[in-house]
Structure formats: C-alpha cells, structure tokens
C-alpha cells in the first residue's frame, strides 16, 4: 500500500494544505482491527475482510509475480507451477494480504512449498531475495526500480501473476468528517487520471 497511497494523496493535499495526515503502513489483520475500533477513516487492502462490513472504492489492479535475484539462472521461457516446490520461498508474516494471496494460490494448485524465511515487510522480503536467500511472490507495484536496474527478475510461471484489486475501504457505519467526504469525491473525479499518469507502466509487464 505504501507504494500506492502517496500518489492518491499528493494532489489532494495540495488542494487542502492545512490537512494533517497519519499514514500507517501495517499488515491486513492490523488494518482491519483499526477499522473495527474506529481508529482510522480509510484502509487500503488487496483482500477484503470477511468479518467486517465495509464500503469500498476500487483503486487499481494488484498483480503478484514470482521473482528472484538476477544472479540465479532461469533459462526457460515459462515454468510450470510446481517450480514453487523446488525453490526456497520467502514469505510475509501471517496476517499479511500478500501472504494470504500466496497461500491461496498454493492451496488451489496443491503445491507443497518449502518456506525458507518469513519477514514482516515487503521491503525486507525484497532485500532477502536480492541477497539470494530465496524467491518470493511480490506485488509488481513495489519492485519497479529493482526490475529496471536488474537487481530482480520475474520468473515466468503458468498461472501467475496472481490477480487482485487494491481497494480503499471504510466501515459501513463510519461517520465521515467533511474532509474525508472531500477525499472520496476527489478520488471519484481523479482516480483514473492518477492511474494513467503514475501506474500505466504496470501494463507493459
């Protein structure tokens, strides 16, 4: 989420320079608890909560690819899904939306994956992959620079990328402040322009 939300906030904050904002980057399970306790106005998730009734705005697609460091050779043009059973896999922690997406994919495809390492942020996972500790399935939105510079490579696998959607959600019974209502109106008007200007590159991968 930290790779996305700043771009959906920047122009809004220019229009409302007096607004003070707190942006907390955490995993999905903690995000849902914050909504339940009415501690936040909005949350950004790629998997909708099952235990909480929310409203939402779909922001943009979320695609997760299998990646490794560039020093590891993967010469085939495309691999079968069972490659995931033969390489060390680095996972996010329990409660992470990325972790949940990976586990759903593995369960759906009856894959017995060897967990090499578990880390608590996408940045930590990314650095571990670059260091050669294993491979991981990661959101493309967070690895643009590493793909461009050659520190990471995408391993083409049948059935990947995993497809989901980034949703801005809020509690169904949330009573919004005027500025929160203004932000929703801003998103409805400018969402597509932001996606086109800031994230169009994801369509070329």
Label each region the model flagged.
Residues 51-94:
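Flexible hinge/capping segments at coil-to-helix
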Residues 47-48, 70, 140-142, 159, ...:
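Short secondary-structure boundary segments
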Residues 1-52, 119, 205:
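Central regulatory/effector-binding core of bacterial HTH transcription factors
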Residues 55-65, 149-162:
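Short beta-strand->loop
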Residues 74-75, 88-109, 176-180, 184-185, ...:
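Secondary-structure junction motif
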Residues 3-4, 153-197, 204:
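A late-sequence structural motif
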Residues 27-32, 36-40, 45-46, 103-154:
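Hydrophobic hinge/microswitch elements
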Residues 8-16, 99-112:
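Ligand-binding cleft/hinge of the Venus flytrap
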């Amino acid at each position: 989420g930290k790779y996305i939300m700043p771009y959906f906030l920047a122009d809004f904050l220019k229009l409302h320079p007096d607004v003070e904002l707190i942006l907390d980057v955490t995993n999905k399970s903690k995000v849902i608890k914050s909504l339940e306790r009415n501690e936040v106005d909005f949350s950004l998730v790629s998997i909708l909560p099952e235990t909480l009734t929310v409203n939402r705005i779909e922001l943009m697609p979320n695609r997760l690819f299998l990646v490794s460091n560039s020093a590891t050779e993967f010469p085939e043009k495309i691999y079968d899904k069972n490659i995931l059973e033969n390489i060390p896999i680095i996972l996010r922690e329990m409660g992470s939306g990325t972790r949940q997406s990976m586990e759903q994919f593995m369960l759906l495809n009856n894959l017995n994956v060897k967990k090499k390492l578990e880390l608590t942020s996408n940045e930590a996972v990314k650095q571990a992959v670059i260091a050669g500790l294993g491979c991981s399935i990661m959101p493309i939105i967070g690895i643009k620079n590493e793909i461009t510079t050659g520190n990471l490579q995408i391993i083409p696998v049948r059935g990947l990328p995993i497809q989901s959607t980034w949703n801005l959600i809020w509690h169904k019974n949330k009573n919004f402040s005027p500025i929160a209502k203004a932000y929703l109106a801003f998103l409805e008007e400018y969402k597509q322009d932001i996606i086109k200007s800031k994230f169009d590159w994801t369509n070329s991968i």
